[in-house]
């Protein structure tokens, strides 16, 4: 019997976008009700995806600026990044391009990225939107647009509270590592035939 392949998956994104909740929801099927800013936490689980067993190492990072110098230490050896933003925070969405992509490409230029929009359950929650008049929900189309702009392998939206698509996020991360997307072939420019 062969040993399971180890995959290091690192969550990255602004503080309070739901990175830790997503990890807890995935690993324990529970939703934490209190917000506790993360320093660094690691989880490990054996997971079967498409018949392959992998040992998925989950690394949580703190998005707060206080950790800008520490956070990159967790990037070493990463196989895939889960780059998260809140579907209810325009600032966290904009920081994907402004802050996170430059940081990830500086420290880990070739590691694939799964872009994740979190808090999906709140995007259509009328009461939440009434209580938070400044919230401008990010649409699925905007998420797909950002995926293309940053060169992410996949874009998914999830809710840690309802667990909608949470497993799909981690399955996608594993698949990106096990079956990397084939690079697109550049078509050669052909000259038209000219007969004399």
From Swiss-Prot:
Protein name as catalogued: Rac-like GTP-binding protein RAC2
Keywords assigned by UniProt, alphabetized: Cytoplasm, GTP-binding, Lipoprotein, Membrane, Methylation, Nucleotide-binding, Prenylation
Annotated SUPFAM superfamilies: P-loop containing nucleoside triphosphate hydrolases
NCBIfam families reported for this sequence: small_GTP (TIGR00231)
GO cellular component: cytoplasm; membrane
Organism lineage string: Eukaryota, Viridiplantae, Streptophyta, Embryophyta, Tracheophyta
Lipidation sites (S-geranylgeranyl cysteine): 193
A GO molecular-function descriptor: GTP binding
């Amino acid at each position: 019997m062969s040993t399971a392949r180890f995959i290091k998956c690192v969550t990255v994104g602004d503080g309070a976008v739901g990175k830790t909740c997503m990890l807890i929801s995935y690993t324990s099927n529970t939703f934490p009700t209190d917000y506790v800013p993360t320093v660094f936490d690691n989880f490990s689980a054996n997971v079967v995806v498409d018949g392959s067993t992998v040992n998925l190492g989950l690394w949580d990072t703190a998005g707060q600026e206080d950790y800008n110098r520490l956070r990159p230490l967790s990037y070493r050896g990463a196989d895939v990044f889960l780059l998260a933003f809140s579907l209810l925070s325009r600032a966290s969405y904009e920081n994907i391009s402004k802050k996170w992509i430059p940081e990830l490409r500086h420290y880990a230029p070739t590691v694939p990225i799964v872009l994740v929009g979190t808090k999906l359950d709140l995007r259509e929650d009328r009461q939440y939107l009434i209580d938070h008049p400044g919230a401008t929900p990010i649409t699925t189309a905007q998420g797909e647009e950002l995926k293309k702009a940053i060169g992410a392998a996949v874009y998914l939206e999830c809710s840690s509270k309802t667990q909608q698509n949470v497993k799909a996020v981690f399955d996608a991360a594993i698949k990106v590592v096990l079956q990397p997307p084939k690079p697109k072939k550049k078509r050669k420019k052909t000259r038209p035939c000219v007969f004399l």
